[in-house]
Amino acid sequence: MAKLQSSFKNMLLSLTLIALVAAAALAGVYMLTKDPIAAAMTEKQQNAIMQVLPDVEGDIRIAEAEESNGVTLYKAYVGEEWIGTAVEASTEGNQNMPFGGTFRLMVGFDQVGNVVNYEVLEQAETPGLGALMTTWFKSKSNILGKNPATTNFSVSKDGGDVDAITASTITSRAFLEVVVKAYNGIAQQPMPIEATSGATQLTTEEGGQQ
């Protein structure tokens, strides 16, 4: 019996030591990779901002980030002229979205609220569907060049004006709701008088969100 107890203590001690070594190794890996990962994420975010803004001549200056209506705004200027806004929005905090995972988008709008472009910053969707999300809506027959205030940013199955990803209506609904969420962030912001024609915040009943 004493030998059995001794073996049990040795086994417990060994497991404890293994756990401590593993924890220390994980902590070391985290410390080594934390800064490179953060730098890569920042670079991806900055690249996405430039990708979704209007194509204009001159040096684009990005103003300090602003929070609005649950999204992050990056207003862009050439000199003193405001040319558009890149908006970072995600499914996080949206309990009513019919979507099991989470994703983050960077959506670009021009001065009147038309969608210029978008980039997927992060997504936890099924790999095939996630890849489709990055390109599916990038055509003028889909959402580019359109304004959520004048176009129903819902899938056609729900009576909207946007074609859903094939066999993935739920993901398409969630994607479009995030785009409308991004638009509502800029709709609450002051805009030049000549650029206010599309700056009307949407409600669930008005089209963009279901």
Model-derived regions: residue spans:
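Flexible, solvent-exposed loop/hinge segments and secondary-structure transition points
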Residues: 2-210
